[in-house]
Amino acid sequence: MKVVEIRESFGPDSLQLVERPEPVPGPAQVLLKMKAFSINYRELLVVNGVGRWKPPLGRVPVSDGVGIVVAAGTGVSRIKIGDRVSPIFYPKWLEGRVAAEKMVRALGGAAADGVLAEYTVFDEASVVRVPARLTDEEAATLPCAGVTAWNALSSFGDITPGDSVVVLGTGGVSIFALQFARMRGARVIITSSTGRMPSRS
């Protein structure tokens, strides 16, 4: 199968299309045929080898995507072959508050391959079904930016009608936060380092 790897050095020119054996799902795992991907600012940090995001060479980048389940290992019961699913950004963070031990294996970063491949394998517990009303491309934007914004406003912020929400710039997390805050009846204030960006939002 074809995958994209960070090879030989860091930076966008380090990305190379290479061949790897198609993965086989083990017990409680599913095999996905990937259909769409989404690029976040974090991908630039990973590909450029910046700070804690610096991966080993040979890493498959990109954390967000959508695929179709094409095979399942023994013991898989919640997800079925043919389901359209998205891997979660932190496959080991299944519940509870943020903690370092749950965050160490973010997809496509320092400790785990990402989804920029024809096929990927994940634990059944680490994928979620995608709503039919969303296209593959729309759903592929949710795992990092969408869930980050939702978690900030719903779990930490508990935004209610009439609240004010300040977002920084017009990146993916900010635009999701703007939409979610408006859905909850909040007033949204966008800040920016230039005068042009807020007027376009």
Annotate the PLM regions.
Residues 21-37, 50-94, 111-113, 131-134:
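Glycine-rich beta-strand-centered segment in the early N-terminal region that forms part
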Residues 84-85, 132-201:
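Mid-domain Rossmann-like dinucleotide-binding core that forms the NAD(H)/NADP(H) cofactor-binding site
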Residues 12-21:
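Short glycine/threonine/proline-enriched tight-turn/helix- or strand-capping micro-motif at secondary-structure
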Residues 33-35, 123, 169:
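A secondary-structure boundary/capping signal
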Residues 92-102:
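Short, Lys/Arg- and Gly-enriched loop/turn segments at beta-strand edges
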Residues 41-48:
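Cytochrome P450 core scaffold surrounding the K-helix E-X-X-R motif
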Residues 114-127:
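Glycine- and charge-enriched low-complexity intrinsically disordered segments
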